[in-house]
């Protein structure tokens, strides 16, 4: 007997899309937009979600330094491998750019929060930036919804899914794992 199963392409988990190296070549940093060919391929695939800022490289991602004009953004430490002399990675493909792309292709962001450098307040600020309505400022302090609006997106991004860190025990096969830096730091401070 033949069985036929219909699969809704929106129910297929999407892609793990990294911020580094201009989205690994899918983002045009000169024009600050996704490359047209990638957009078409993505739409054809019908992915329903985008995991950002990536997997293990998200462990040291500082979302706040990816906001605003690219000339003012600070380089990131790659969260997986950090080869000597690398000098950091320009976060051209930042949180605003991935959110704009997600809107364009009708996909949902699955945000991987940086357990390696974040804290509860930073995570709350991120949720406010992504999801708060302008004028609400639920965390007090910096009005992150207004920062989002000032960066060109007045409506909330409505991100529903968050992961906390990624493979925190993973070692780097092609460089020095960021976890090795944390271990050395903690040992030097007498922390076990």
Task: Name the predicted role of every residue range.
Residues 1-192:
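Non-catalytic accessory regions flanking glycosidase/transglycosidase catalytic cores in CAZymes
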């Amino acid at each position: 007997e033949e069985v036929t199963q219909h699969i809704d392409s929106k129910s297929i988990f999407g892609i793990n899309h990294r911020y580094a190296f201009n989205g690994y070549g899918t983002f045009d940093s000169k024009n600050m937009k996704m490359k047209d060919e990638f957009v078409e391929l993505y739409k054809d695939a019908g992915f329903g979600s985008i995991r950002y800022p990536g997997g293990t490289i998200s462990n040291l991602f500082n979302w706040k330094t990816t906001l605003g004009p690219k000339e003012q953004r600070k380089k990131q430490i790659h969260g997986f491998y950090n080869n000597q002399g690398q000098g950091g990675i320009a976060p051209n493909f930042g949180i605003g750019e991935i959110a704009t792309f997600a809107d364009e292709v009708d996909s949902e962001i699955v945000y991987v929060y940086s357990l390696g450098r974040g804290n509860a307040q930073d995570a709350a600020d991120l949720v406010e930036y992504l999801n708060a309505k302008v004028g609400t400022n639920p965390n007090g302090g910096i009005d992150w919804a207004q920062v989002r609006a000032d960066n060109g997106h007045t409506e909330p991004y409505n991100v529903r899914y968050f992961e906390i860190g990624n493979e925190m025990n993973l070692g780097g096969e092609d460089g020095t794992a960021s976890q090795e830096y944390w271990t050395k730091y903690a040992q030097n401070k007498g922390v076990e």
